[in-house]
Amino acid sequence: MAGHSKWANIKRQKARVDAKKAQVFARLSRAMIVAARQGLPDPAANFQLRTAIEKAKAAGIPNDNIERAIAKGAGTLSGDGRQFESVRYEGYGPSGIAILIEALTDNRNRTAANLRAAFSKQGGNLGETGCVSWMFRQRGVVQLTGAIAEADLLKALLDLPAESYDLDESGAIVYCSIADLEALSTQLRQLGYPVEDSELRWIPNDYQLVTDGEQARSLLRLLDTLETLEDVCSVTANLELPPELVTALEATL
């Protein structure tokens, strides 16, 4: 198992906090809709839905909103004629960085137009289905927070259904198969590890290093824009940035 972190990917996706409460509610509601759509609408039998509900409650989303989101995902919400579907979009950012986007939409044309405009503004382009998805694979991701002793973590993971991990001073990210996510999260909690989040994520097979400051700035602006679009549920890119460039960019973005 290798232990090194790729900035601007998993950690970046989890560390960002939306400034507007409405955006937080919308994003968490979409997560519940997607989870209910992809599995059973019963949280006791659907780990992803149960996790999404826990996040929603922690953010202060009212129970009525949670129930509506689950019903919408299950297709049982009365009085709402909109039909939502999960759609995956793919494209390239500056420097040829591959970007994979998961969206939940009731209007594909609107979503595609918004994505296309965002890509074009920062020098990228929205591509055809399949153009970059082969560069990613879906895995289970468990995020741990706080100081983690690598030797102790590695010893624990040898007896758990983990495939690999990334570790730095702020915590660790442990990867596993889709089927093992619930078991891994539960067992890490039982061992006393501070599990902050557990979810399915698209992970790049390889990362592309970008060292040019302007290209990196355009890429991060593009990712920020994509993440705030109404229909977007998640954004993943095969981007890696040198630590010194990260430090320089943090002061300007």
Curated annotation (Swiss-Prot):
Q: Which residues cross the membrane?
A: none
Q: Which InterPro entries match?
A: Integrase-like_N (IPR017856), TACO1_YebC-like_2nd/3rd_dom (IPR048300), TACO1_YebC_N (IPR049083), Transcrip_reg_TACO1-like (IPR002876), Transcrip_reg_TACO1-like_dom3 (IPR026564), YebC-like (IPR029072)
Subcellular location, principal: cytoplasm
Spell out the subcellular localization from the entry: Cytoplasm
* One GO CC annotation: cytosol
Coiled-coil region(s): none
Biological processes annotated in GO: regulation of DNA-templated transcription
Keywords (A to Z) from UniProt: Cytoplasm, DNA-binding, Transcription, Transcription regulation
Query: GO: which molecular function terms?
Result: DNA binding
* Family (UniProt): Belongs to the TACO1 family.
What NCBIfam families does this protein map onto?
PRK00110.1 (NF001030), PRK12378.1 (NF009044), YebC/PmpR family DNA-binding transcriptional regulator (TIGR01033)
Which PANTHER family does the entry mention? TRANSCRIPTIONAL REGULATORY PROTEIN YEBC-RELATED, TRANSLATIONAL ACTIVATOR OF CYTOCHROME C OXIDASE 1
**By what name is this protein known?**
Probable transcriptional regulatory protein syc0529_d
Question: From which organism does this entry originate?
Answer: Synechococcus sp. (strain ATCC 27144 / PCC 6301 / SAUG 1402/1) (Anacystis nidulans)
- What taxonomic classification does the UniProt entry list for its organism? Bacteria, Bacillati, Cyanobacteriota, Cyanophyceae, Synechococcales
